[in-house]
Amino acid sequence: IKTDIVIIGAGPAGSMAANVLRDAGKSVVIIDKSNFPRHKSCAGGLTPKTIAELPFDIKALSQHNSDKMLFKFTNGKTVDLNNELGACKMVIREEFDHYFFNFVIKKGADFINSKVEKISEDDEGVVVQTNNETLRCKYLIGADGANSTTRRLITNLKYKNPVFAFEGLVKRENSKKDVPTKFVFNKLGYSWIFPKQDHYNVGIGNLIFDPSCPKPRKNDLLDFVREELECDQLEHITGFPIGTEGKCYEPSSKRM
């Protein structure tokens, strides 16, 4: 398969890149190991700056308009941020990513649901090998996140020091409190509550890699929910590592 650009990763970054390139008349193939829709661990808040950059209206995807955000710090102090226009709008990442993905497919981007196994470069461009296809392109974009397969395949960078987080959902009907968008900083790092139409997205995670700092556990998330929402009914708990060495990488190729 020959194309102008291959994009690895069909999340928002990959979809945005595909949108810009299709508008410029370039042929694009997006590769992702997951098919869509797929679950994505994420609180799901979009800032006004982000929304302004999107090529579509998110009204149909918006779950909640957060005109108030509360920050609670380890010293006990709290800070309220109020914005009548909305500090951020809440979406469900599975729905948002699926919508954006379909948006660029309708624009003419092609999609291959496959796992990338090898990336190489020669005088004519870049060759990408998946578990069932070989693609040749002029340029390659790695848009596959903090735990990037692209970065791993084209560098010697190792993910030695990931930070960890747990995410879950609390149905609004089970919460004894009506809570705004909230960040709570604690000994583990930070926790969050992001309101949606019928549930709260809640989570707890490390802010930075620190060997002396314990990793969050499921019970830490449950304790947070009990304290902030007075509820112990926590559903759809997922844990995920986030690579932290991306800043150490600088591309050595002008094509990738």
Positions of PLM-derived features:
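Glycine-rich FAD pyrophosphate-binding loop
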Residues: 19-41
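Conserved N-terminal helical subregion
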Residues: 52, 56-59, 65, 70-153, ...
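FAD/FMN-dependent oxidoreductases across multiple families
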Residues: 118, 210-256
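Hydrophobic anchor at the start of a short beta-strand
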Residues: 5, 26-28, 140
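Conserved FAD-binding catalytic core of PHBH/FMO-like flavoproteins
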Residues: 147-222
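Conserved N-terminal glycine-rich FAD pyrophosphate-binding loop of Rossmann-like flavoproteins
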Residues: 34-57
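Beta1/beta-strand and adjacent pyrophosphate-binding region of the FAD-binding site
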Residues: 1-13
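Conserved acidic residues
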Residues: 4, 138, 255
